[in-house]
Amino acid sequence: MKETIYKQLEKVREASRKLCTLSDSDINSLLNDLANRIPGNSQTILEANQKDLDRMDPNDPKYDRLLLSTSRLESIASDIRNVAELPTPVGRILEKRTLPNGLALKKTTVPLGVVGIIYESRPNVTFDVFALCLKSGNATVLKGGSDAMYSNMAIVDLIREVLVRNNVNPDTLYLLPSDREAAGIMLNAVGYIDVIIPRGSQQLIDFARKSSSVPVIETGAGIVHTYFDLSGDLQMGKEIVFNAKTRRPSVCNALDTLLIHRERLDDLASIAEPLAEKKVIIFADKDAYPALLSRYPSELLQKAEEKHFGTEFLSLKMSVKTVDSLEDALKHIARFSSMHSEAVIASDAVVKDEFLKRVDAAVVYANTSTAFTDGAQFGLGAEIGISTQKLHARGPMALQELTSYKWVIEGDGQTRA
């Protein structure tokens, strides 16, 4: 298998070197062609997706991530069109100056080269990643999970067909076999792949980080907190907590832990009331539990254990922790946060400013839902992932994060003494 994969990766590397010959207009035309062909191929894609769904327990938190539908495919097509409309990130001049010796120097953005994505469940990622990589001049190597095998194969077949129709080398995109051996080969394909971006569970991300000899950009798990301050508006709190927890509980920006100021415990039942409609299970600490007892459905209320803090639930479950102050909330977040998205609900400007300044996360919010941590919501088009690390990229990663830069120097015969 290793030899076969390396031969294909060499073709991908060669294809990546030719992408610089495509104009931005060529790329945009190809992306729009792909978006326009999704509806006509939706039946084939959805049938393949159903084969994957049939192999998964509907109660599995990953089921919703795996699920495609006509409306989701329409949304994907719209996202691809949005990417086509964005300005190219390649060729931007970051710095430009003339040195004392007359050399003209400029720093300009260039593609990373070959981008490898290892991911689980989400077949929409196949479309998103290809669109972003092509727009930024990169070739793409995909390693999807076995749970989305049929979906990914159908999507890649469509994309490669569109590449050929637009006179672009189909080796610009390569889908690896879905088994674990292929993942190991990919993670050590130095010289073939320039960067690996894992998307999925913390287990997958840890595996990629520890096993890879290719540079890795982590798109970390989301252990997401919202702190309801002493000065928080009750109605705002109800709406934000409900949205952050229930909009799409299986995604990484969904709320996991509500921190509530001790002096607002009397309002906890009101904040939690809408959650009962969605049958959200609450793990409440020793102070929050009595505040919810008899005011929240007993079958949905449990006493919290230490393990419930620092857990990414990815389902209709959440924990509640009582804190005595903003300082306590900050300490709890510092201990359990995955540095993804954190929010505060407060009217006190000092509290808001202190929270936004001191919380170490890729995205911090005041008086709004963490559900907005998303490349499309940020106006970036589709996203490649949400990075929780600090080097190269942080937060929603889109086109700009798929580029590096090089120095271009022009002279008229200068030599160095």
Curated annotation (Swiss-Prot):
Major localisation: cytoplasm
PROSITE patterns: PROA (PS01223)
Protein's cellular compartments: Cytoplasm
Keywords: Amino-acid biosynthesis, Cytoplasm, NADP, Oxidoreductase, Proline biosynthesis
Entries under InterPro entries matching the protein: Ald_DH/histidinol_DH, Ald_DH_C, Ald_DH_N, G-glutamylP_reductase_CS, Glu-5-SA_DH, GPR_dom
Pathway listed: Amino-acid biosynthesis; L-proline biosynthesis; L-glutamate 5-semialdehyde from L-glutamate: step 2/2
GO cellular component terms listed in the entry, alphabetical order: cytoplasm
Record EC number: 1.2.1.41
Catalysed reactions, as listed in the record: L-glutamate 5-semialdehyde + phosphate + NADP(+) = L-glutamyl 5-phosphate + NADPH + H(+)
Gene Ontology molecular-function annotations: glutamate-5-semialdehyde dehydrogenase activity; NADP binding
Catalytic EC class: oxidoreductase
One GO term of the biological process aspect: L-proline biosynthetic process
Family that this chain belongs to: Belongs to the gamma-glutamyl phosphate reductase family.
Role according to the record: Catalyzes the NADPH-dependent reduction of L-glutamate 5-phosphate into L-glutamate 5-semialdehyde and phosphate. The product spontaneously undergoes cyclization to form 1-pyrroline-5-carboxylate.
Protein name (database record): Gamma-glutamyl phosphate reductase
Source taxonomy: Bacteria, Pseudomonadati, Chlorobiota, Chlorobiia, Chlorobiales
